[in-house]
Amino acid sequence: MNRSFHFLIKYIYIHVLLVFYFHIKQQAIMPFFIFFFSSFDGLSFDLRVVAFLAKHVFVGVCSPFFVVGFFGSSRVVVTEWLSKLVLPPPPVSITQVFSLSRKRGEFSSGYILIINPYKSFLRSLLDFSIFNNTAKNKSSTFTLNLEDVSK
């Protein structure tokens, strides 16, 4: 089996675990859909697709929703695209959950989870940052460790 197939199996496994975690531990944060995409190449295209789906497909259907993707060394491009599309400039942290605030009904509350494939996939699952965009457009970041939450 080639390397990309192993990546695929790992990330499908992670996504299933995340769905169960949010379903059991955080019932107020129910994932509606997981969009699995690879962005090793064609990163700009992938993020355009994510933005289109978030704006035209998921909004108004179920809130919150999840869009899941991963990237490697191009985090600067990811930051630029996300800040232009739906968010203020995010923190530098690679593995993040972005919380979208309501803006005149244009976006429902939602989350974009970006997993770093170059970390251990278990570490990516257990330790990630949450980006919180408040109503006053002030940003705060904190780290959520799922090991601590599950105790």
Curated annotation (Swiss-Prot):
GO biological process, one term: cell wall organization
Gene that specifies this protein: ECM12
Protein name: Protein ECM12
Subcellular location: Membrane
GO cellular component: membrane
Its membrane topology: Multi-pass membrane protein
Transmembrane regions: 17-37, 51-71
Species: Saccharomyces cerevisiae (strain ATCC 204508 / S288c)
Glycosylation (residues): N2, N132, N137
Protein keywords: Cell wall biogenesis/degradation, Glycoprotein, Membrane, Transmembrane, Transmembrane helix
Record's function text: May be involved in cell wall organization and biogenesis.
